[in-house]
C-alpha cells in the first residue's frame, strides 16, 4: 500500500479438500438433515473433475462461514479485494465440465444453474463493497454468464471485472498451430472484442495457466532456445529473436487496447521471462530449480529483456496519459486479411497494427473520428524497445475530410511490418 499498489487475494470458495481427517468433510453443525454440514450429501457434494468437495451454498452456516472468511481477510490483512477462483464451477451443477457456451440464454438460466451459489456470490459482492467501497472483485468465469459484472442492485452478481480467459487461449492456439503469416485478423479481432457490453473485463496474454510445467510462455514459443543464447544486445539479433521481440510487443499492445477495460501481466511476462514455473513436488524430486522468476534478466544492461520491460512501462504510461483502458470508446475501423492490418480506435487514440511478415504499410490511409493533427504516441519499433527506429515521432499527420472506412476523417501513416503504432491527436 505504501507503494500505491492494490493487493487482491485469489480466494477459493468454489471447492474444498476431500479430507475428513483434518478438513471439513465430516464436520456437523449439531443437527441432522439438510444443511447439517458444509457439503451436500451424495454426488452433489463432490466435484468429480477436481476430486474435491462442493460447498452447500444454500446452508446458512456455510454462508456465514464463507462470508466471514472474506471479512476476515479484508479486516485482518487489509486486502483490497479478491479474485474468485472457479466461478464457472460454482454457477452450474454440471460445473461447466465439457460444456461449450454459445451465448444462448438457456445455457445460463436453467435447472442446471446453481441458484444457491449465485445467491452466495451476490451476497459476497454486496458484503465486500459495503465493508470496503473501493474494493475490487474479479470473477474467473469461462461461460460468459450474463450480468456477472453488473451491480447487485440491478440484479447482477456484483463483480467489478471478469477475466477474459478466451484471449490467452487464442494466442497460445495461434502460436502453437500456425505461423504468423496465417493468423486471421478478423479471428483475432472477434476474440478480443467478444465480451459483454457494460461488463468490464480483465485482458491478458498469459497467466500461470500458460506458464506452469508442461506449457510454455509466449516468449519461449516465439523464440525457443534462442532465449538462452541469442538475447545479447551487444550483437545483432537473429531472425528468431527479431521476430519474437516484435510480435511479443504487438501481442501485448493489441491485447491491452482491444481486449478489455483492465490489463493483467503475469509475473515475468512484462520482460519475456523464458522459463515456466514449477513448484517443488514429488514428480520433480522436490526441485526448486524452476520455482523462481529471474528478475535479474530485465536488469542486465547487455540483455534484450530490458527492451521488453521498457515497452511494458511505456504501455502503462500511455494509459496513464490518455486513459484509454477505462474509455467506453472502442472501435475497429479496418480489418485487412491480405495486408494483415488492424486499425483500432480506443479512447482518444488511433492504433494501427501491421502483422504482415515482410510488407511495410507506407502511405496507409486510416480513418479517425476527429479532425486535426496527429503525432506518434507510441510505436513498437522504437530503439528504446529493441526496434529499428523506422517510425518518426516528429512527423505531423494532418487529417483530411471526406470520410474513410465509415469514419468522418482520415490520415496517412507509416507502419513497418510486425509493428504497431499509436497516434494521438494534438490539441489546438
Task: Locate each region found by the language model.
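Conserved alpha/beta catalytic core and glycan-binding cleft of carbohydrate-active enzymes
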Residues: 78-80, 95-284, 288-291, 320, ...
Amino acid at each position: 500500500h505504501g507503494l500505491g499498489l492494490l493487493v487482491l487475494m485469489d480466494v477459493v470458495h468454489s471447492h474444498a479438500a476431500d479430507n475428513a481427517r483434518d478438513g471439513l468433510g465430516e464436520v456437523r453443525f449439531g443437527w441432522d438433515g439438510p444443511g447439517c454440514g458444509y457439503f451436500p450429501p451424495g454426488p452433489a457434494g463432490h466435484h468429480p473433475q477436481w476430486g474435491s468437495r462442493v460447498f452447500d451454498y444454500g446452508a446458512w452456516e456455510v454462508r456465514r462461514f464463507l462470508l466471514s472468511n472474506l471479512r476476515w481477510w479484508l479486516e485482518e490483512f487489509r486486502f483490497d479485494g479478491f479474485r474468485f477462483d472457479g466461478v464457472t464451477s460454482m454457477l452450474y451443477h454440471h460445473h461447466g465440465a465439457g460444456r461449450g457456451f454459445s451465448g444462448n440464454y438457456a445455457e445460463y438460466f436453467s435447472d442446471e444453474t446453481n441458484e444457491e451459489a449465485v445467491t452466495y456470490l451476490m451476497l459476497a459482492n454486496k458484503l465486500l463493497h459495503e465493508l470496503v467501497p473501493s474494493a475490487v472483485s474479479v470473477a474467473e468465469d469461462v461461460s460468459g454468464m450474463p450480468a456477472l459484472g453488473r451491480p447487485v442492485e440491478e440484479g447482477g452478481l456484483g463483480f467489478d471485472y471478469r477475466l477474459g480467459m478466451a484471449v490467452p487461449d487464442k494466442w497460445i492456439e495461434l502460436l502453437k498451430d500456425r505461423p504468423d503469416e496465417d493468423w486471421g485478423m478478423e479471428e483475432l479481432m472477434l476474440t478480443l472484442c467478444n465480451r459483454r457490453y457494460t461488463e468490464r473485463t480483465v485482458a491478458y496474454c498469459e497467466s500461470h495457466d500458460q506458464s506452469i510445467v508442461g506449457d510454455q510462455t509466449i516468449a519461449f514459443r516465439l523464440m525457443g532456445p534462442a532465449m538462452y543464447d541469442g538475447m545479447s544486445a551487444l550483437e545483432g539479433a537473429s531472425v528468431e529473436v527479431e521476430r519474437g521481440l516484435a510480435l511479443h510487443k504487438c501481442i501485448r499492445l493489441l491485447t491491452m487496447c482491444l481486449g478489455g477495460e483492465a490489463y493483467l501481466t503475469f509475473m515475468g511476462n512484462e520482460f519475456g521471462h523464458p522459463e515456466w514455473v514449477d513448484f517443488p513436488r514429488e514428480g520433480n524430486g522436490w526441485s526448486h530449480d524452476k520455482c523462481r522468476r529471474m528478475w535479474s534478466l530485465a536488469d542486465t544492461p547487455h540483455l534484450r529483456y530490458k527492451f521488453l520491460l521498457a515497452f511494458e512501462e511505456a504501455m502503462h504510461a500511455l494509459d496513464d496519459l490518455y486513459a484509454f483502458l477505462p474509455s467506453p470508446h472502442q472501435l475497429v475501423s479496418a480489418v485487412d486479411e491480405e495486408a494483415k492490418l488492424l486499425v483500432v480506435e480506443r479512447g482518444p487514440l488511433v492504433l494501427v497494427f501491421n502483422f504482415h511478415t515482410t510488407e511495410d504499410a507506407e502511405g496507409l490511409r486510416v480513418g479517425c473520428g476527429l479532425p486535426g493533427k496527429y503525432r506518434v504516441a507510441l510505436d513498437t519499433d522504437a530503439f528504446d524497445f529493441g526496434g529499428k527506429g523506422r517510425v518518426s515521432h516528429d512527423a505531423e499527420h494532418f487529417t483530411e475530410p471526406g470520410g474513410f472506412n465509415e469514419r468522418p476523417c482520415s490520415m496517412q501513416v507509416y507502419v513497418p511490418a510486425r509493428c504497431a503504432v499509436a497516434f494521438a491527436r494534438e490539441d489546438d
